[in-house]
């Protein structure tokens, strides 16, 4: 379980926790959305922090709401080292209740990329950049081309 391994926990310092912190993000944030989730973010020099809002309108059962939050926390835990600083608040939409865990995770990643918090992945099927040879790297015995 995560409690026994502190490296796998989601630290308190990486969470938006109080009503005042949520209010600051909602009042001063930029927004982007997806059919499953909505992201409110506020960039800053602070380490990245995540807040979640999953209401009973999304799923009336606590089990369903907790599943959505668990998937988002797990995705955030793996992204913390490469994520840009600031506060990120995810608001789940009712379609998230019927979505699978990978669909929720993919929607979260899409929103973070759209917000500029994550680097864009390399396009599949593209060639790697060509290695150029600098003239100083050629040995003296090799002829110049």
Swiss-Prot record:
Physiological role: RNaseP catalyzes the removal of the 5'-leader sequence from pre-tRNA to produce the mature 5'-terminus. It can also cleave other RNA substrates such as 4.5S RNA. The protein component plays an auxiliary but essential role in vivo by binding to the 5'-leader sequence and broadening the substrate specificity of the ribozyme.
Subunit composition and interactions: Consists of a catalytic RNA component (M1 or rnpB) and a protein subunit.
Report what the protein is called: Ribonuclease P protein component
The EC class name is hydrolase
Q: Does the keyword DNA-binding apply?
A: no
Q: Which residues does the annotated region (Disordered) include?
A: 120-145
Keywords in alphabetical order, please.
Endonuclease, Hydrolase, Nuclease, RNA-binding, tRNA processing
Taxonomy, superkingdom: Bacteria
Q: Which InterPro entries match?
A: Ribosomal_Su5_D2-typ_SF, Ribsml_uS5_D2-typ_fold_subgr, RNase_P, RNase_P_CS
Q: Which organism is it from?
A: Xanthomonas oryzae pv. oryzae (strain MAFF 311018)
MF-aspect GO terms: 3'-tRNA processing endoribonuclease activity; ribonuclease P activity; tRNA binding
| A GO BP entry | tRNA 5'-leader removal
Protein family according to the UniProt entry? Belongs to the RnpA family.
- Entry's EC annotation: 3.1.26.5
Compositional bias, Low complexity, is annotated for 120-130
What's an example GO cellular component term for this entry? ribonuclease P complex
Query: Spans of biased composition, class Polar residues?
Result: 134-145
HAMAP family associated with the record? RNase_P
Q: Name one Pfam family in it.
A: Ribonuclease_P
The reaction(s) annotated as catalysed by this protein in its Swiss-Prot or TrEMBL entry are: Endonucleolytic cleavage of RNA, removing 5'-extranucleotides from tRNA precursor
């Amino acid at each position: 379980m995560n409690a026994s391994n502190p490296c796998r926990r989601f630290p308190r310092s990486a969470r938006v926790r109080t009503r005042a912190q949520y209010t600051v993000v909602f009042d001063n944030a930029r927004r982007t959305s997806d059919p499953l989730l909505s992201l409110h973010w506020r960039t800053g020099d602070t380490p990245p922090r995540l807040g979640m809002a999953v209401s009973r309108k999304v799923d009336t059962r606590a089990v369903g709401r907790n599943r959505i939050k668990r998937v988002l926390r797990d995705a955030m835990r793996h992204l913390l080292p490469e994520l840009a600083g600031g506060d990120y608040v995810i608001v789940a939409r009712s379609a998230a209740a019927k979505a699978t865990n990978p669909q929720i995770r993919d929607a979260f990643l899409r929103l973070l990329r759209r917000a500029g918090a994550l680097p864009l992945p390399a396009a599949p099927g593209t060639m790697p950049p060509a290695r150029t040879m600098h003239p100083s790297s050629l040995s003296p015995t090799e002829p110049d081309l």
